[in-house]
Regions:
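Canonical Rossmann dinucleotide-binding motif of NAD(H)/NADP(H)-dependent dehydrogenases/reductases
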Residues: 11-41
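Active-site loop of short-chain dehydrogenase/reductase
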Residues: 12, 62-63, 87-88, 133-146, ...
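Catalytic loop of short-chain dehydrogenase/reductase
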Residues: 18-20, 140-165, 171, 175-178
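Conserved glycine-rich Rossmann-like NAD(P)H-binding loop of the short-chain dehydrogenase/reductase
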Residues: 38-52
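The beta1-alpha1 cofactor-binding region of Rossmann-like NAD(H)/NADP(H)-dependent oxidoreductases
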Residues: 48, 68-79, 108
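Catalytic Tyr-X3-Lys loop
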Residues: 97, 104-123, 142, 166
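A short, exposed helix-loop element centered on a Lys and neighboring polar residues
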Residues: 126-127, 171
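Conserved small/polar residues in nucleotide/adenosyl-binding loops
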Residues: 190-191
Length: 191
């Protein structure tokens, strides 16, 4: 039993923040990483998404831990990565809030909330992931972007600005930490 416990605690880990519907990208990545033999820490501000996903991963023979996390809450993001420990291999930031609205009808709270989830949350997540990867000088950090990361679109001004900020954050982190063995990428998702 002691050998099995030691083996489980030293499993490579993946952290995925932004787990929503079962058919969504975050959930599908969690299932894939679990199939690859990783212990997956799934995080979402929506507990019901976690309650559905974790049993599914375990039923398929994988290891998963649910960690309710608000991407914009620094303490919760730090705690998420403390749960991952030193065995962190992959971190995926998939949080977003794509709600349309005309700019002249937006209030500051609406605009700021989009920025906080897409950009500030990405900063908190990326910073904490890289802190845990640097001692080993290896790891992969992936941010999910969208076509909004590259160009503006009518009625999506808040989302466009937030996602383009996330894109340039990923570029900066790639240039800072790539030479130290940390692979940082922004994957553009276009449906």
């Amino acid at each position: 039993i002691h050998h099995q416990q030691k083996q489980k605690s030293s499993m490579k880990k993946a952290v995925i923040l932004g787990v929503g519907p079962e058919a969504g990208l975050g959930s599908q990545l969690a299932l894939r990483f679990a199939r690859e033999g990783m212990h997956v820490l799934v995080a979402s501000r929506t507990p019901s998404a976690l309650e559905k996903l974790v049993p599914k991963i375990r039923e398929s023979g994988g290891e998963a831990t649910a960690v309710p996390t608000d991407a914009t809450n620094e303490e919760q993001v730090v705690s998420l990565f403390e749960n991952a420990g030193a065995d962190l291999e992959v971190a995926v930031y998939n949080a977003g809030n794509n709600h349309p609205g005309r700019i002249v009808e937006m209030d500051t709270e609406y605009f700021e909330n989009s920025w906080r989830v897409c950009c500030l949350g990405g900063f908190l997540f990326g910073r904490e992931a890289v802190k845990r990867m640097l001692p080993k000088k290896k790891g992969t950090l992936i941010f999910t972007g969208a076509s909004a990361s590259l160009r503006g679109r009518a009625n999506f001004g808040a989302f466009n600005s937030a996602k383009s900020g996330l894109r340039t954050l990923a570029q900066a982190m790639s240039k800072e930490y790539g030479p130290e063995g940390i692979h940082v990428a922004l994957s553009l998702i276009h449906i």
